[in-house]
Amino acid sequence: MRRRAWIVGLAIALATPWAAAAELRPSWECLPADTAFMVRVPGLGEFWKTIQERTKFGAVALGPKRLEGLWQAIASIQDDEGEWSLEQYEESLQKYGLETSDLVKVLDAEFGGSLVLRHRDKKTPLAMMLAWLEPGNEGAGKLLAAIRQQLEESADEEHAPKRTDIELAGHEVMMTAIPVIELDMDGVDLPDEGEFDEAALDALVERMKNAKAQKTGERYTFVAVMDGRLLVGSGLTTFADPEGDADEAAGVEEMRRIFATFLEAHSGGGEPALAGVYREPAIAAAALPGMPLVEIVAMPSVLVSVLNAESGLDEATVQARLATVGVDDIGSVVLRQNFDAGRWKATMAMTLPAPRHGFLEILDQPCDASEVPAFVTREVAEFGQLSLDLGAAYKTVRQLLLAQAEGEQVANMYSVADMQSQAWLGVDVATVLSGLGTRHWFLTFPPQIAEVLAKARAADESGEEVSTVADRLAAVWQIADEGPYVKLLGRLAQLAGGGQLEEEQGFKGVRIPGGAAFYVGRGHLVMALGEGVLEKTLAAIRTPPQGDTSLRESDVPRRAAELLPARPARGYGVSDATRTGGSLGMLRDLAEAMEPDDIEDESMRGVFVALKDLLPSAREMEGMFGIGTTLLRMTDDGLLYETAWEMPAP
C-alpha cells in the first residue's frame, strides 16, 4: 500500500506543472482572475541539455556518469532505511504501465501550476490548485491509467479515495475525493513547560495512540486529458463536524465550476485574465532574453482582497492601514531565471509605483554609486553594498508610528531610547544611525572549513569548548565622528566582561568571546566574524591594497559591469567564484575535510564516501564558474532586483 500511495502521489505531483499544445491556448491564459500565484517551466529537458552542452558546470557536474552515481547513492540510502530500492522503484512503475523514461519525457515539455484564492460569503475562503503538463497523448493516457489502477487497488481499504467520473464543459473528468483523517485531540493536553520529561512524553504518545481518528474533510482532485495535455485541479474542504455539512458541498460545487471554467477556456478566445499582469510596466521591463528556466508570478492583490473580505473591516480602514505600510498600490511580482550567451541570469520585479509612501518611502532615498571601496582585497569572495541612510529611515518610521492610534505610547518609547542614547553616547538614536553614513559594506571571505572541523575534533577529544564558526564575514562603515561609537563599544566591552577597549593596529575595540569583534579607528567602524577577518580588514583599511591584491583594481568590477551596468543602486554586489567554486566548491571543501568517523551514523559512512567521490575535484572545477553581480534598484514603476553569473563554456 505504501508504494501505491507513493506512485499515486508522484503521478498527481507530476501534474502540478504546465504545457501548451498547438490546438489549445496556453494553459496560463486559461487561469481565472483570482489566481494568486503561478509558476511556469517552459521546458526543463531542453534547458538541462543546454547547460550540459554549453557550460563546464553542466559538462562536469551534471555529466551522465555523475548523475547515475548520484541516483545509485540516493537509492542506496533509501534501501538502507528500508524505504525503497531502485529495483522496487522500477517494479512499481512497471506494475502501472510506466517506465522512468515516461517521467523524464514529461520534463521535456512545458509544465506549470497555480493557486486560486476565492472569497466566499460567510464561508471559509476556497483555495484551489490548477495545474497542467503536456506529456502527449500516449503519456497522458499512461498517467491517467496508472492513477485509475491505483485507485481501484485501494478501493477496499479503510478511508479509501472515492472516484466519480463526471462531465465538465464537455470533457470527461475523473473526480476523486480523498478523506482527510486526523486524530481527535480533545482532552489530550501538552505537559506544562518544565514538565516535558521522558515520562510525560511517553504518556502523551500513549494518549495519542488511543485517540480516535475522525474525518475532518476531503481533498477533491479533478483530472482531465485534453489533446495530449493533462489538466488537474485540487482543493480541500473541511467539515464543521465529523458528519459534514452544507459548507462542504458548497465548496465542492465551487471547485467544479472553477475547473469547468478552466477547461472551457482552453478552446476559447479573448484576452487572458492575467494579461494585465504582463502589461504592468515593472513586469514587462523584467523580461529576459535567452532560454528560460522558470517564471514565477505572484498577485498579492488577490490575497489582500480575500483577507480584506475576511477581516470584516470597511474598505477605507483597510486602505488606510495598507497606505501606512506603503503597499496600498502594490501590483504583481515576477521572478524569472534564464541562460543566455554563457550567463545565468535572474530577475525579480515588483510593481510599486513612485513616489513610494508609508514605510516604503525609505526606498526612495538617493542612491550611492555602485563601486568597490579601496580597502577590499582580492581575497574577498563576495562584496556587497547597501545604500541607505538609517537615521533618515528611523525618522520616517517614527513619524508614521506616532501618527497611529497608539502614537502617545510609541512617543514615550522613542523618548526613552533617545534619553538613554544621549546619556551614554552624547547624541540621539537618529544621529548614531546617520553617523554610519549611507554606504554599508559587507565582505565575505572564503570559509575555513578544514580548520574548523579540525578544531571541533580536537575539542571533542579534550572536552573543551571552542568556537566552530566556519563563516568569515565583515561589515564596514565609514564614519565622520568616531566619538559616539567608541563610547558604544566601551559599553559593549563592559557587558562582555572585559571592561576596557583593546588596541589593534591603531583601532580600538572589543572581541566578544566566541563571537564577533567590533573596532573603531581611522574613520571606520568594523564588525568582523571568523578567524583572521578582523586583522585582515583593519590592515587593508590602514594600507589599501594595490594591483593584484586589490579587488577594486582587478578585472572583477569590469567583468561584473559587463553582466549588469554598475549604475547607482539601493543594493550592489560582486562575487568571484573562479577560485572558490561558489556553493559547489564549499560542498567539495566540506567533503574533503570530513572523515568517515565524523558521521555518527555508521550505516551512512559508506554513502558519504560514495557521494564524496561524485563531487568534482579542485582541478575539474578550475574555470567552472566566473564572476557574479547583483543590483537592487527602485524605478518609477517599482522594485527591480537583478543577478547575473558567468557560466564558462567547457
Regions found by a protein language model. Give the residues of each.
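Bacterial N-terminal signal peptides that target proteins for export
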Residues: 1-7
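Bacterial N-terminal signal peptides
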Residues: 7-17
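Structural boundary/hinge residues at secondary-structure and domain interfaces
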Residues: 21-216, 273-334, 339, 345-466, ...
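Helix N-cap motif at beta-to-alpha junctions
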Residues: 134-139, 235-239, 479-483, 530-533
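Short, intrinsically disordered low-complexity segments
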Residues: 168-188, 507-534, 612-625, 635
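A conserved glycine-rich beta-strand in the N-terminal activation segment of trypsin-fold
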Residues: 212-306, 513-605, 611
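Loop/turn-rich, solvent-exposed surfaces of beta-rich toroidal or solenoidal domains
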Residues: 463-482
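C-terminal regions of mature proteins
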Residues: 478, 616-650
